[in-house]
Structures are given as structure tokens and as C-alpha cells.
């Protein structure tokens, strides 16, 4: 059983909060708040409370200008430590989510877990301080899963721990069509035909962007992972489920 699920938008929200904090850092806002508190304390002790607002307005003029684009602002100091702490919670939450899904399915289907493992992409390896975007960890001897598409399934492999590849491997097949392009260019009848032999109730307009035709071929994947992963086998799906919206609209 292969389950693909993340933090259910929590990680995105945390990232947006800290990107705003990074922007404020580069505007000097943290420094301004610190100086502001010092001014308030100092003027109150001197009995000059009536002058505080005027002084703060003058102080504020020295902050707020960015010398780099907002999307390139980065975190440092306590803000970085706070972010790493919170994002680790998001990653643990995502892992717990997958475990719970598996547990519920196994209970309903009267199945017993023999073994399990997690392969994570688009995350921060907190222990090694490696950011993996579009990549998974593939240290030597580690069992990994590389998903391809709804039809071809996933590659089960063992990591080689290749230092030249940052102890990583590709996280999946990779797209040849963006989600927008897939929905504009692909035909649902061809999509349905390509899934023949695999039981699924998820072939619909809402999942057209996940059609096998939107991804690179299996052969392309084997060529690029050979330096990072030893392939054990390809796990072919017999059943595939994706959230797919309204049945009435999607099966016209």
C-alpha cells in the first residue's frame, strides 16, 4: 500500500508566515521593535511619556526599505531557529497523517502491517540541514520509493548514498506537462483508456492533471536514478484512488 500525503496545507501556511517574517527582518522590523521598546522604557523613566509618540514616529522613518526582492528574503538568528522548529512539527504531523490513513484502511480491510517506511520530498532534513526540493533522501542502504504515475506505479529501491547527489535521489517521474497544460491538452477518453487493467473510480476531469500522459516515461526515470538508487522492483498498481470531486460533472 502506497500513501501519498503531506501536511494538508499546514506546511504552506507556516512557510507563508515565516516568509513575511523574513521580509520584516530585512526591513529591520525586529531591530525597530527592540529599539522602540528601549525608547518607551527610557522616556517613561525620564518622565517624558508625552514625547514618546513623536520620537517613535521619527525612529520609524529609518526602517522599512528593502534592498532585495521579497521572495529572496531569508531568515536568520532566532527567526531561523523558530522556523526550523515549526517546520519539523509540520513534517511530523504529515508523517502521523500517513500512519493514520494506513491504520484506518488496514482496520477496515482486516489487514496486518508487516513493515512500513516513509519517503519524503519537498522538505528540510533537520538533522543534516539539507533542503530537498523535488528530491528524496537516499543515504546508503536506505529503502526508498519513487512514484511514477497512476498507471506505472512506483519504484522500490535502495539508496546508494551518493555524495555527488547530496545523498539524494529524484522524488518522482517529473512532469512533461504542467497541471494547467495537462487539463488543457489531454483527453479524458485517452486518460481512461491508459488506465485499463487498473481498478479505479478516480478517472475524472478533476484528476486529468495526474494522467499518466502528463509524466515522463519509466525508461527516462531509470536512466536518471542509476547513480543514486539501486532498483529492487517496480510496484505495479492494481487499485488507484485519488480525490476526484463531483462524479456527475466528471463523467460526462
Give the role of each language-model region.
Residues 1-252:
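Domain-length cofactor-binding catalytic modules of enzymes
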